[in-house]
Amino acid sequence: MSCQQNQQQCQPPPKCPPKCTPKCPPKCPPKCPPQCPAPCFPAVSSCCGPSSGSCCGPSSGGCCSSGAGGCSLSHHRPRLFHRRRHQSPDCCESEPSGGSGCCHSSGGCC
């Protein structure tokens, strides 16, 4: 091979075109979301239905307490004779309305 042929093969590739400039950011900053009220235990609507006559809140340990009366507080250990009724320390008894009444560790109810 001659020297000229080698030089032609070794030329660097053509330069890439410059990248597109990024789009300008929007002029207005995004609006701040409205401030939320102080967080509370799960809202009654997301926890227990009013038809079951039960409520949810710190007084019941964040659990749904049904009319049949059965909320196993997460910080209370089930007693031996209650072992069959309380399968988990974070669970409530079934509610008359058909809801499971289970309490999640965050204090919410299914």
From Swiss-Prot:
<comment type="function">
    <text>Precursors of the cornified envelope of the stratum.</text>
</comment>
<comment type="similarity">
    <text>Belongs to the LCE family.</text>
</comment>
<comment type="subunit">
    <text>Interacts with CYSRT1; the interaction is direct.</text>
</comment>
<protein>
    <recommendedName>
        <fullName>Late cornified envelope protein 2C</fullName>
    </recommendedName>
</protein>
<keyword id="KW-0417">Keratinization</keyword>
<dbReference type="GO" id="GO:0042802">
    <property type="term" value="F:identical protein binding"/>
</dbReference>
<feature type="compositionally biased region" description="Pro residues">
    <location>
        <begin position="11"/>
        <end position="23"/>
    </location>
</feature>
<dbReference type="InterPro" id="IPR028205">
    <property type="entry name" value="LCE"/>
</dbReference>
<feature type="compositionally biased region" description="Low complexity">
    <location>
        <begin position="1"/>
        <end position="10"/>
    </location>
</feature>
<feature type="region of interest" description="Disordered">
    <location>
        <begin position="1"/>
        <end position="23"/>
    </location>
</feature>
<dbReference type="Pfam" id="PF14672">
    <property type="entry name" value="LCE"/>
</dbReference>
<dbReference type="GO" id="GO:0031424">
    <property type="term" value="P:keratinization"/>
</dbReference>
